[in-house]
């Protein structure tokens, strides 16, 4: 398993990962956050998972919709005190 601890963009990364975990920078705006999700999809191995921690009031519904659009799936892995952890898996047939 490759590990990536901190980064802001995927442009300079040539690797693929099994898991990417993020608490996205919501204040940067939806365009930035959604672009990150698209970059994560491109950099996940087949069967790789993206985990997103996000507050309901800061875009959880639109994140769920966007992840379903990009990955074709999105599940609530956990939720507590207004926070959601979404899991999307890259399934390549």
Task: Identify the residue ranges that each predicted region occupies.
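S-adenosylmethionine
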Residues: 1-93
């Amino acid at each position: 398993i490759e590990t990536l601890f901190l980064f802001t963009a995927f442009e300079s990364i040539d690797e693929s990962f099994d898991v990417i975990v993020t608490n996205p920078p919501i204040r940067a705006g939806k365009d930035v956050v959604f672009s990150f999700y698209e970059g994560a999809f491109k950099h996940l191995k087949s069967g790789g998972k993206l985990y997103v921690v996000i507050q309901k009031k800061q875009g959880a519904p639109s994140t769920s919709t966007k992840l379903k659009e990009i990955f074709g799936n999105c599940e609530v892995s956990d939720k507590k005190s207004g926070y959601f952890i979404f899991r999307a898996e890259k399934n390549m047939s």
